[in-house]
């Protein structure tokens, strides 16, 4: 599994692809669906639809990466999130323009949505301090209490279409920072 997320910005040939296990994979199934600018009716892109087999492969890849990722020290796990945040900020204007053309949002709304998404990445970067396990002696007579936080495994999110610059960032950075794969 690669931890260099800079390659996320490297595919620009117009082919619908999914990002799995550190690689861009061409979708073998359905050719995807047109993305239409609601203001003009013009087709501006295509989005891929993965086959069931491709989804199963993505889940298997995430499952394979999980043991190593959960064992990665938390300070190391958040490093890709710093890179991700920097990329989001670097490309914020382009991403906002994409939201405007794909969803008919105003520029102000699109920029605000992205800012709120970036704020979630910032919060996830701060997760190590919140992950400290607690221990309470004598919570009740002869009872000590200990909280243990452990990664759970593979996470996925099916998010609504209306806030694509924000809602996925309610899930992905927190899952990754806490040692889960996504």
Positions of predicted regions on the chain:
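Secondary-structure boundary/capping motif
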Residues: 27, 109, 164-167
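A short local loop/turn or secondary-structure capping micro-motif enriched for an aromatic residue
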Residues: 34-35, 52-55, 165
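Conserved small-residue-rich beta-alpha loop and adjacent elements
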Residues: 134-182
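Hydrophobic face of amphipathic alpha-helices that form TPR/SEL1-like repeat modules
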Residues: 1-39
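Glycine-rich loop-to-alpha-helix module at the N-terminal edge of alpha/beta enzyme cores
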Residues: 42-131, 142
